[in-house]
Amino acid sequence: MEVTSFILNATFKEFACFGNNYLIILPGIMLERNVFRHLNYSTNSICSHYQFFGGHYESFELLVVIVYYFSHVGSFSLAEIYRITWDKRIVLYGTTTTLVYCSEGSD
């Protein structure tokens, strides 16, 4: 599970700007098993609303972020974002091959 730890450590700040209630489902963990790590994190990020796949996501929405990690250290080749609806359905919002980080400054 070294890779899992690395991903959590490397992406905590970057994902923080996506809001207060987000789930990151790491490689090898299946959505159907309902096993995930719940991040509840507030930030003073420059992001007040979130743009992904050309869409806008309000901060109160609950999203599931599935990140596929490929060998290149620190790089993410694919991400999928799902939304958990009020009636507990899971809706795919889209996929991206470039996970855009939204962090605060300093290269």
From Swiss-Prot:
Subcellular location: Nucleus membrane
GO cellular component: cytosol; nuclear membrane; nucleus
Transmembrane segments: 62-79
Top-level taxon of the source organism: Eukaryota
Bilayer disposition of the protein: Single-pass membrane protein
Keywords of the record: Membrane, Nucleus, Transmembrane, Transmembrane helix
Protein name: Uncharacterized protein C16E8.18
Taxonomic path: Eukaryota, Fungi, Dikarya, Ascomycota, Taphrinomycotina
